[in-house]
């Protein structure tokens, strides 16, 4: 059993003195793991977010298998001095490692992650919007798309200021004001991202409001269902 693909490193764990278990998010094979040998330049080659050419081989598809890797690009040095960006990319990698099913392609999510890495690498000011879009897309790809297009009660598309924590659907101000303490806020930034307006810049506080909402649904639909702890790094993004 053998395949070749490109992939982004989302986790790396030492296995003995001379080996590493790599977890890759690949373009055509989804999340895959494999054993690879440590080399003199391993610290540089096997950083989170690095893009690799990978050749995987094993006797059976369900085996861990072996990975031969060739570095295509190492973007981490572009943003490692920016604490928020570094935490963001490592946090999202951890999320993918924990919730993505094995061997199921998610090509759209993969392409968007590659694009997001380019966005932060080139210091695009709208990178936070692109990140929220990634988390929304992850929910969608795994079958939990939020419906933020109209009010769940009345169907109106204006003045959407809340989100139901039970259904993941938008609620208008007129309806939601009566039980606002039981609803999540619907930040303007998240509204724009949902409607594919990713170019605006917002305050960090607005970004954190968006993170609280997407984080709530990531935890509810994915982590709690898998009985897996929500990543501490993701929580750290709310306290910076």
Curated annotation (Swiss-Prot):
<dbReference type="GO" id="GO:0006302">
    <property type="term" value="P:double-strand break repair"/>
</dbReference>
<keyword id="KW-0233">DNA recombination</keyword>
<dbReference type="InterPro" id="IPR012340">
    <property type="entry name" value="NA-bd_OB-fold"/>
</dbReference>
<dbReference type="Pfam" id="PF11967">
    <property type="entry name" value="RecO_N"/>
</dbReference>
<comment type="function">
    <text>Involved in DNA repair and RecF pathway recombination.</text>
</comment>
<comment type="similarity">
    <text>Belongs to the RecO family.</text>
</comment>
<dbReference type="InterPro" id="IPR022572">
    <property type="entry name" value="DNA_rep/recomb_RecO_N"/>
</dbReference>
<dbReference type="InterPro" id="IPR042242">
    <property type="entry name" value="RecO_C"/>
</dbReference>
<dbReference type="GO" id="GO:0006310">
    <property type="term" value="P:DNA recombination"/>
</dbReference>
<dbReference type="GO" id="GO:0043590">
    <property type="term" value="C:bacterial nucleoid"/>
</dbReference>
<keyword id="KW-0227">DNA damage</keyword>
<dbReference type="InterPro" id="IPR037278">
    <property type="entry name" value="ARFGAP/RecO"/>
</dbReference>
<dbReference type="InterPro" id="IPR003717">
    <property type="entry name" value="RecO"/>
</dbReference>
<keyword id="KW-0234">DNA repair</keyword>
<protein>
    <recommendedName>
        <fullName>DNA repair protein RecO</fullName>
    </recommendedName>
</protein>
<dbReference type="Pfam" id="PF02565">
    <property type="entry name" value="RecO_C"/>
</dbReference>
């Amino acid at each position: 059993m053998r395949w070749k693909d490109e992939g982004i490193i989302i986790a790396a764990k030492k296995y003995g003195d001379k080996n590493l278990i790599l977890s890759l998010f690949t373009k055509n094979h989804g999340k895959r793991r494999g054993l690879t040998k440590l080399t003199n330049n391993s610290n540089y080659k096997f950083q989170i977010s690095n893009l690799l050419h990978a050749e995987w081989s094993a006797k059976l598809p369900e085996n861990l298998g072996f990975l031969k890797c060739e570095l295509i690009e190492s973007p981490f040095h572009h943003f490692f001095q920016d604490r928020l960006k570094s935490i963001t990319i490592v946090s999202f990698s951890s999320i993918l490692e924990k919730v993505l099913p094995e061997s199921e392609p998610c090509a759209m999510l993969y392409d968007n992650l590659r694009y997001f890495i380019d966005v932060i690498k080139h210091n695009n000011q709208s990178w936070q919007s692109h990140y929220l879009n990634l988390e929304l897309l992850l929910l969608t790809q795994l079958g939990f798309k939020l419906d933020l297009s109209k009010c769940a009660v009345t169907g109106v598309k204006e003045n959407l200021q809340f989100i139901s924590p039970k259904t993941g659907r938008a609620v208008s101000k007129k309806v939601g004001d009566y039980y606002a303490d039981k609803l999540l806020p619907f930040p303007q930034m998240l509204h724009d991202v949902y409607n594919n307006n990713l170019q605006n810049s917002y305050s960090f506080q607005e970004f954190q409001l968006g993170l609280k909402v997407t984080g709530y649904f990531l935890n509810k639909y994915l982590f709690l269902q898998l009985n897996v702890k929500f990543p501490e790094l993701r929580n750290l993004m709310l306290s910076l």
